[in-house]
Amino acid sequence: MRVVIIGAAGHIGTYLIPMLVDNGYETIAITRKMSMPYEDAPAWHKVKRVLLDRENDSEFIEKLKAMEPDIIVDLVNFNIKETKKIVEGFGGTGLFHYLYCSSCWAHGMAETIPFNTDDLGKEPLDKYGKDKYASDINLK
């Protein structure tokens, strides 16, 4: 299976990508610039690295589709507009999963920790949290 990771060189991607490669996934790492992962695991040398900027490339979705991913892991989607572009752009394709990385900011303050997201009042903390929450709802 081919997995495309958007925002691959950040904290989560640094550790996720070697696990995917080590488990036999063909992995494509998308970053806006040639950023190095926090740790240079040997698995990173088996990864195809692609420079692509969703905010500044009007053909982002088409270029993403051309990679023919089975799974997309989106670690840097910050607004509902981008979520909808992915969902609409990949409708009817062979995409098996779209994994969207949300944020605790989408849920608001918790009275107890750890918290159950189903028990929260869903009062996002700011615009970032509101956008993440809107994407959460859109993807359900």
What label would you give each PLM region?
Residues 84-133, 137-140:
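Conserved Rossmann-fold NAD(P)-dependent oxidoreductase catalytic core, especially the SDR/UDP-sugar
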Residues 6, 30, 75, 98-103:
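SDR active-site strand-loop-helix element
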Residues 26-31, 72:
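Short, hydrophobic beta-strand segments that form beta-sheet elements in well-ordered domains
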